[in-house]
Every structure is written in structure tokens, then in C-alpha cells.
């Protein structure tokens, strides 16, 4: 595979990624000619991050927020080259893919493993979780599989409604109504004034749906 589009906006970085970048720059200044053991370096960064106060982390969190805003702004104006037109900017309001049974299992046991073995790397933690899952009896896996199936079913309904109407919560109002809304929108696309009115209505709908979710 070749390199991606060089004009594509650089991906957004997390607060921890900014912290690691800063650590790397500090290390280079102190030891410009020394080679870096990535595994050992990552471990030290992780340990240092855990001991930092919320105030100390705040600087990096602000950097991450600013970078996220930059990324979203650039992606709105980014036009992918031919052949990549299907790769659209990921809508933050789109329904999130449901976790697998194994992922749910990991979410529950990862904190326990980290607590018992604080020195383990991310890779080692993942390996240990994989071994635990493989050694778990089918009956014990069942609750995770059942929950994952329910989440998958909900996701399929939400994504169908989202694709029809363009809103993640449209399933509450039904897919049929969502399709009517889409048709209405297409008919009004040529009339700018009506299109503006429709956008205002959509915003009101979203606010109402968010209120429903909060209840």
C-alpha cells in the first residue's frame, strides 16, 4: 500500500500523546546521540503520567482540545482525491459501533490487571486479557455475549435510522418517518430559504431528542 494523501489533515492527538511527545523532545535535548528503547521509554512515560496531578495534565488536555478543533475544522474543507470519495469525515454524532463480548470483558478486567500488575505494558495487559478470555468457560462468557448482542441490535437500528435521516436518535421516531424527512429535504434543496428553515427545525428536533435522552 502506498502513502495516503499528503494533503489530508494530520490526525488529532490525545492529551497523553502530547505528553509523550514532550517527553521525547526533552529526552532528545538531554541525550541527543542516545538511542531510545521504545518499550522502556513508553513505560517510564506511563508511570510519570499516572503520578501527575490534574493541574499538570491540564496543559496537555488543553493542547488536545485545540488540536481536535483544528482537525475538525480542516476536515470540513478537506476534499479527498478521486477513489477516496467514500471516505467522508466521520460524523461525531453517528452511532458508535457496538463493542464485542471480548471488549466488554476487557473493560471489566483491565483495571483489575493494571491494579495487580502496575508495571505491565499495554501489550502485555492485552495479552493477559486474551489468555483470560480463552480460559473463561462458555457459561461465564454468556453474559458478555448476551450484552454484546443487545448492543449490536440497538446499533443496527440506530445506524439504519441515522443513514435514512442523518441523525443518530432517529430510531425513536421510526425509520419510516426518517425516510419521509429525507425525501422532504431533497425536494427543498433547490430553495435556499426553505432549506434554512429546515435546518432550524432539525436543530430544534435534536434539542428535543437530547432532552428525551437526558430523561
Curated annotation (Swiss-Prot):
Its chief place of residence is nucleus
Per the Swiss-Prot or TrEMBL annotation, the motif Nuclear localization signal (NLS) 2 is positioned at 178-184
Q: Which cysteines are cross-linked by disulfides?
A: 23-45
Q: Which SMART domains match?
A: HMG (SM00398)
Q: Subcellular location, in the record's words? A: Nucleus; Chromosome; Cytoplasm; Secreted
Q: Where is this region: Sufficient for interaction with HAVCR2?
A: 1-97
Q: Where is this cross-link: Isoglutamyl lysine isopeptide (Lys-Gln) (interchain with Q-?)?
A: 28, 43-44, 68, 180, 182-184
Q: What membrane topology does the annotation report for this chain?
A: Peripheral membrane protein
A single Gene Ontology MF term assigned here is:
supercoiled DNA binding
Where is the region LPS binding (Lipid A)?
Answer: 80-96
Q: Its function?
A: Multifunctional redox sensitive protein with various roles in different cellular compartments. In the nucleus is one of the major chromatin-associated non-histone proteins and acts as a DNA chaperone involved in replication, transcription, chromatin remodeling, V(D)J recombination, DNA repair and genome stability. Proposed to be an universal biosensor for nucleic acids. Promotes host inflammatory response to sterile and infectious signals and is involved in the coordination and integration of innate and adaptive immune responses.
| Record protein name field | High mobility group protein B1
Organism name: Sus scrofa (Pig)
* Organism phylogeny: Eukaryota, Metazoa, Chordata, Craniata, Vertebrata
Amino acid at each position: 500500500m502506498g502513502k495516503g494523501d499528503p494533503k489530508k489533515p494530520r490526525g488529532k492527538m490525545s492529551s497523553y500523546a502530547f505528553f509523550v511527545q514532550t517527553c521525547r523532545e526533552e529526552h532528545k535535548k538531554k541525550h541527543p546521540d542516545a538511542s531510545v528503547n521504545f518499550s522502556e521509554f513508553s513505560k517510564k512515560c506511563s508511570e510519570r503520567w499516572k503520578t501527575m496531578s490534574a493541574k499538570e495534565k491540564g496543559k496537555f488536555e488543553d493542547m488536545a482540545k485545540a488540536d481536535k478543533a483544528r482537525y475538525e475544522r480542516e476536515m470540513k474543507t478537506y476534499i479527498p482525491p478521486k477513489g477516496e470519495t467514500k471516505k467522508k469525515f466521520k460524523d461525531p454524532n453517528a452511532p458508535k459501533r457496538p463493542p464485542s463480548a471480548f471488549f466488554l470483558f476487557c473493560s471489566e478486567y483491565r483495571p483489575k490487571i493494571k491494579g495487580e500488575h502496575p508495571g505491565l505494558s499495554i501489550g502485555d495487559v492485552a495479552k493477559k486479557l486474551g489468555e483470560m478470555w480463552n480460559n473463561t468457560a462458555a457459561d461465564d462468557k454468556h453474559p458478555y455475549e448476551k450484552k454484546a448482542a443487545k448492543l449490536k441490535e440497538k446499533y443496527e437500528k440506530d445506524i439504519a435510522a441515522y443513514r435514512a435521516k442523518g441523525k443518530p436518535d432517529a430510531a425513536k421516531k421510526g425509520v419510516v418517518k426518517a425516510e419521509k424527512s429525507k425525501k422532504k429535504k431533497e425536494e427543498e434543496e433547490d430553495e435556499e430559504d426553505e432549506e434554512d428553515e429546515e435546518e432550524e427545525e432539525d436543530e430544534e428536533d435534536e434539542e428535543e431528542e437530547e432532552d428525551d435522552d437526558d430523561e
